[in-house]
Curated annotation (Swiss-Prot):
The keyword Repeat applies. Belongs to the PPR family. PCMP-E subfamily. PPR repeats lie at residues 41-71, 72-106, 108-142, 143-173, 174-208, 209-239, 240-274, 275-305, 306-340, 341-371, 377-407. InterPro entries: E_motif (IPR046848), Pentatricopeptide_rpt (IPR002885), PPR_At4g14850-like_plant (IPR046960), TPR-like_helical_dom_sf (IPR011990). One of its GO terms (biological process) is mitochondrial mRNA modification. Residues 488-518 are annotated as: Type E(+) motif. Keywords: Repeat. This is Pentatricopeptide repeat-containing protein At2g20540. One of its GO terms (molecular function) is RNA binding. The keyword Repeat applies. Residues 412-487 are annotated as: Type E motif. Pfam families: E_motif (PF20431), PPR (PF01535), PPR_2 (PF13041). GO terms for cellular component: mitochondrion.
Length: 534
């Protein structure tokens, strides 16, 4: 076939490139393109690089690009985009530097979004700010897609100031602009600012609502997370799998079983149970809400279990004190060739701790380090020390506190203190208490624990001294509380709090309940210590 000019040849091959489906077809077309002398055509090579991106053959894309003597900005953008899609961020930076150094062309509005994403993925704030400077110098500064990518980059660097500055200076904002800023604030736990921004938004999408739910869950404000979940539904927005995964931990922490069951049915109806993340969150919710049988059933029905699935089930067994269930699940995990992680071993150690299986605890701790090269964190040391202390192996537990690579925290010293109620362990108790006074000077519970130990030993002068210290320091116990779920709404009641609506009526009902309960009679001094009265 005779062609008149390079453009006609290019136009001839474009439909073939658009229809190609297999690598064999692609190779034949590519050979024809080279035969017709188009290896230097930036236009044709751009199309070929785009196809390489689609089939994830970046080695060939690189060879095609390198053959072109003078690539234009469209070809540069194509190879930068392809490298970004395939997570080759260092190559993105290399090509960008080549564009600045060797090309007569400048980066444009299609270049910068991929550059900002690559800098963020590399975690290089320095590079990101340099590219931002290039945008101000070369690029069309006020372009919403570019500025959205810039906001997202700064948010990933936890740079709220620069992110908000870009947002404030935008000529035009779209819903992605708002959601990028909102999601960043929520991810960093800045929920007051996130809420203010949320209420300014005219177009709230599922992404906006999910960011708020996830943000509140992340900082432990579980009631607020569930409130936003309900408000989202009242606003007519149906939850997706991400919003379900975001709210289920709040259900788990608050014991909101009814809402959790509703989410399970909703997820089943919408086909979300095919998503491993949704099933993992449901297993955790059922475990923490006390319905371990439902968690086991759901786990058994899952396909494609990942390490989180196995670890969540192991932790569920541990939460219910079923060490044998946790160990058997771990054995199944090994047979399934799924590599455990630190969370897996934390669940195993916790399970061993609940039932005093200290030898198994030591074995799993050693297995974690030696077989899987997982460096124990302070939580792992805490569980190991707890299992040894509960089993009466205090000397070994104390030895670990001296040799562990990080300073023991208050949980570790508290675990040691609470295990010192047998005779002969007063010295360990006093050492633990010294550290607790330093770490938690106002925690009355630690003084109560020590007073219990003194009471067990008949050291009533020391009990009296501690009682005087508590009064002089004006220490107060953290008030007890309880949660109750009615009509899918969780209500929290805290000791001494009379701010609830209908508090008078509630008090009358509570008095009726207590009047029918048997009154326990305290018959000896030791009982005073056991119920926390010092």
């Amino acid at each position: 076939m005779a062609f008149h000019g390079i453009r006609e040849v290019e136009n001839y091959f474009i439909p073939f490139l658009q229809r190609v489906k297999s690598r064999n077809e692609w190779k034949k077309i590519n050979a024809s393109i080279i035969i017709h002398g188009l290896s230097q055509s930036s236009f044709m090579v751009t199309k070929m690089v785009d196809f390489c991106d689609k089939i994830e053959d970046m080695d060939y894309a690189t060879r095609l690009f390198n053959q072109v003597s003078n690539p234009n900005v469209f070809l540069y953008n194509s190879i930068i985009r392809a490298y970004t899609h395939n997570s080759l961020y260092c190559d993105v930076i290399r090509i960008y530097k080549q564009l600045l150094r060797k090309s007569f062309e400048l980066p444009d509005r299609f270049t910068f979004p991929f550059m900002f994403k690559s800098c963020a993925s590399l975690g290089s704030c320095y590079l990101g700010k340099q590219v931002h400077g290039h945008l101000c110098k070369f690029g069309p500064r006020f372009h919403v897609v570019t500025e959205n990518a810039l906001i997202d980059m700064y948010m990933k660097f936890d740079d709220l100031v620069d992110a908000h500055k870009v947002f404030d200076e935008m000529y035009e904002r779209d819903v992605i602009s708002w959601n990028s800023l909102l999601s960043g604030y929520a991810r960093l736990g800045q929920m007051k600012k996130a809420k203010g921004l949320f209420h300014l938004m005219l177009d709230k999408t599922i992404v906006s609502w999910t960011a708020m739910i996830s943000g509140y869950t992340g900082i432990g404000c579980y009631v607020e997370a569930m409130d936003f979940f309900r408000e989202m539904q009242l606003a007519g927005i149906e939850p997706d799998e991400i919003s379900l995964i975001s709210v289920l931990p709040s259900c788990a922490q608050l014991g909101s079983l009814e809402l959790g069951k509703w989410i399970h049915l909703y997820a089943e109806r919408r086909g979300f149970l095919k998503q491993t993340g949704v099933c993992n969150a449901l297993i955790e919710m059922y475990s923490k809400c006390g319905v371990i049988s439902q968690a086991i059933q759901l786990f058994g029905q899952m396909e494609g279990k990942d390490v989180i699935s196995w670890s969540t089930m192991i932790s569920g067994y541990a939460y219910h004190g079923n060490a044998h269930g946790a160990i058997e699940t771990f054995n199944e995990m090994q047979r399934a060739k799924v590599k455990p992680n630190g969370i897996t071993f934390l669940g195993l150690l916790s399970a061993c701790s609940h039932v005093g299986m200290w030898q198994e605890g030591l074995r799993y701790f050693d297995m974690m380090r030696q077989d899987y090269q997982i460096e124990p964190k302070i939580e792992h040391y805490g569980c190991l020390i707890d299992v040894l202390a509960r089993a009466g192996k205090l000397e070994r537990a104390v030895e670990i506190t001296k040799t562990m690579p990080m300073k023991p925290d208050s949980k570790i010293w508290g675990s040691l203190l609470s295990s010192c109620r047998t005779p002969g362990n007063l010295d360990v108790a006093l050492v633990a208490m010294d550290h607790l006074v330093e770490l938690e000077p106002e925690d009355m519970g630690n003084y109560v624990l020590l007073a219990n130990i003194y009471a067990d030993l008949g050291k009533w002068e020391d009990v009296s001294r501690l009682r005087k210290m508590i009064r002089n320091e004006n220490m107060k116990k953290t008030p007890g509380g309880s949660l109750i779920e009615v009509n899918n709404i969780v209500q929290e009641f805290v000791s001494g709090d009379n701010s609830k609506p209908f508090w008078t009526e509630i008090s009358i009902v509570l008095q009726l309940f207590t009047s029918h309960q048997d009154q326990d009679v305290i018959t000896n001094n030791n009982a005073l210590a056991f119920i926390g009265i010092v």
